């Protein structure tokens, strides 16, 4: 992706988030964007919208089906993207909208990788640790299981990592022995 395309995607995303922030509809925007992204993940929609082989009329129909019960600002935004023939960038723009929302609200997705699945109590403790140590609000808690950690966990938030895994401790111990 070129710098020009990245700037275009960023500008569209920032504009939508700014409008929704002014209208105090950020939570509704986030819910609607997540729902649309689920459609993208469940289908080949991103490839279809960026394909030159698919007629423009079909692309318009597909994007208009996404509008549904979304907040008016998102539906208007989708129309603007169609009018400007930017539907090929829709998936990347929506992903960027989520990162802009996280930045504006200081609420980030937290990825927790552990050797075994976490209990609800442990998930709550992770949220507390993240808010205290990293000074961010917890968005979605994304849980991954990786038995190679042996024990402990890794928390990743906004490009920051807390690694208390036994695997890392063993690696550090090995390095100290050299």
Curated annotation (Swiss-Prot):
Main location: membrane
Membrane topology: Peripheral membrane protein
SUPFAM superfamilies: N-terminal domain of the delta subunit of the F1F0-ATP synthase
Annotated compartments: Cell membrane
Protein family: Belongs to the ATPase delta chain family.
Biological function: F(1)F(0) ATP synthase produces ATP from ADP in the presence of a proton or sodium gradient. F-type ATPases consist of two structural domains, F(1) containing the extramembraneous catalytic core and F(0) containing the membrane proton channel, linked together by a central stalk and a peripheral stalk. During catalysis, ATP synthesis in the catalytic domain of F(1) is coupled via a rotary mechanism of the central stalk subunits to proton translocation.
Binding partners and assembly: F-type ATPases have 2 components, F(1) - the catalytic core - and F(0) - the membrane proton channel. F(1) has five subunits: alpha(3), beta(3), gamma(1), delta(1), epsilon(1). F(0) has three main subunits: a(1), b(2) and c(10-14). The alpha and beta chains form an alternating ring which encloses part of the gamma chain. F(1) is attached to F(0) by a central stalk formed by the gamma and epsilon chains, while a peripheral stalk is formed by the delta and b chains.
Protein name per UniProt: ATP synthase subunit delta
């Amino acid at each position: 992706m070129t710098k020009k395309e990245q700037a275009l995607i960023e500008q569209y995303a920032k504009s939508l988030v700014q409008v929704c922030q002014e209208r105090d509809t950020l939570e509704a925007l986030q819910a609607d964007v997540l729902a649309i992204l689920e459609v993208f993940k469940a289908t080949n929609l991103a490839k279809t919208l960026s394909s030159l082989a698919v007629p423009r009329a079909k692309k318009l129909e597909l994007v208009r089906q996404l509008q549904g019960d979304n907040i008016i600002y998102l539906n208007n935004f989708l129309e603007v993207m169609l009018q400007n023939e930017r539907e090929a960038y829709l998936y990347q723009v929506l992903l960027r909208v989520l990162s802009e929302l996280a930045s504006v609200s200081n609420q980030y997705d937290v990825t927790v990788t552990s050797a075994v699945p976490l209990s609800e109590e442990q998930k709550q403790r992770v949220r507390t640790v993240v808010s205290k140590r990293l000074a961010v609000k917890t968005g979605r808690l994304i849980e991954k299981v990786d038995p190679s950690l042996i024990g402990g966990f890794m928390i990743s938030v906004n490009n920051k990592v807390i690694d208390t895994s036994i695997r890392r401790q063993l690696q550090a111990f090995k390095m100290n022995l050299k």
